[in-house]
Design a protein with these regions (language model features):
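A residue-level structural signature of the nucleotidyltransferase/glycosyltransferase Rossmann-like core
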Residues: 23, 89, 108, 115-116, ...
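A conserved mid-domain beta-alpha-beta active-site/ligand-binding segment of alpha/beta enzyme cores
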Residues: 104, 109-117, 127
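Flexible, glycine/proline-enriched loop segments at strand-loop-helix junctions
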Residues: 29-36, 85-91, 109-114, 153-154
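Short coil/turn connectors at secondary-structure junctions
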Residues: 18-21, 51-55, 67-68, 85-86, ...
């Protein structure tokens, strides 16, 4: 169903516990280093969410012109309360290389970390204004939840929608916290490889494995012994019921749906 319906459904559950509740949305495949800085960024986001009845997102200072991430342009003159919170000018999709370089050179673009903080009431107001179809379904689900009835038939009718496209890019009451913690999206095997410390020939072995005459390989195999001979830039992942073998040059994140 994509992010908007899922976030809205969770907000309904939070609202039931506390109508004035604040919710956070955190992607599961992100690496965050610097827990105290991360904690402070969340505190700052909560402050703005309450003070301005606003939607808050997190932006990370780019370290290179990545084409794998979306970007957020912020208004440098609009800092709120000296807590690294800025008004959002625009969202930008994953750019081509030249555009990514221009983003970096401008100094007012951040990587979009996909982390969101807001009051559930603010979220529902935004959905009501900018996503009327989803809002109608959410209202029906709210009624079912109040009656402790199943809402699965309504859920099936909801069209997949992204919270970014459906709401964040349309609303004006949105701020970005300029994060100071280290961040990495582990959404590709190259990102996972970059995270680990390298051994001889820049190979990484976690679990049972061996590499001979090969460089920059990644083996994650807790139980099965895996050997790589004469091959470079390979990823081998062993689990109880499956084995994945893929080139690091490939950015494919999934194997077919069948």
């Amino acid at each position: 169903k994509n992010t908007a319906p899922a976030i809205a459904l969770m907000a309904l559950h939070i609202e039931k516990i506390n109508p004035k509740g604040i919710m956070g949305v955190f992607p599961a495949d992100h690496l965050i280093v610097g827990h105290k800085k991360f904690q402070q960024a969340i505190i700052n986001a909560i402050h703005l969410a309450k003070k301005d009845d606003a939607l808050i997102t997190m932006g990370v200072q780019p370290t290179f012109p990545s084409t794998a991430y979306g970007y957020i342009q912020f208004d440098e003159k609009s800092e709120e309360d000296h807590i690294d919170g800025y008004g959002v000018v625009t969202f930008a999709e994953k750019p081509h290389q030249d555009l990514a370089k221009r983003f970096i050179e401008s100094g007012d673009f951040l990587w979009n970390a996909g982390i969101f903080i807001w009051q559930v009431s603010t979220l529902f107001s935004g959905i009501e204004k900018h996503m009327p179809d989803l809002n109608e379904h959410i209202e029906n689900i709210r009624e079912r939840l109040n009656k402790k009835e199943s809402f699965h038939d309504i859920w099936k009718q909801i069209s997949p929608e992204s919270i970014d496209y459906g709401l964040l890019e349309k609303t004006k009451n949105i701020f970005v916290i300029k994060a100071k913690f280290d961040w990495n999206d582990l959404g590709s095997w190259n990102a996972v490889y970059d995270y680990f410390m390298k051994a001889k020939d820049e190979n990484i072995i976690r679990g049972k494995g061996y590499v001979q005459s090969g460089q920059q390989n990644l083996i994650l195999s807790p139980d099965k012994f895996t050997a790589i001979i004469g091959v470079d830039n390979l990823v081998v992942i062993n689990t109880d019921d499956a084995t994945l073998v893929v080139s690091k040059r490939s950015e494919e994140r999934r194997v077919g749906k069948e």
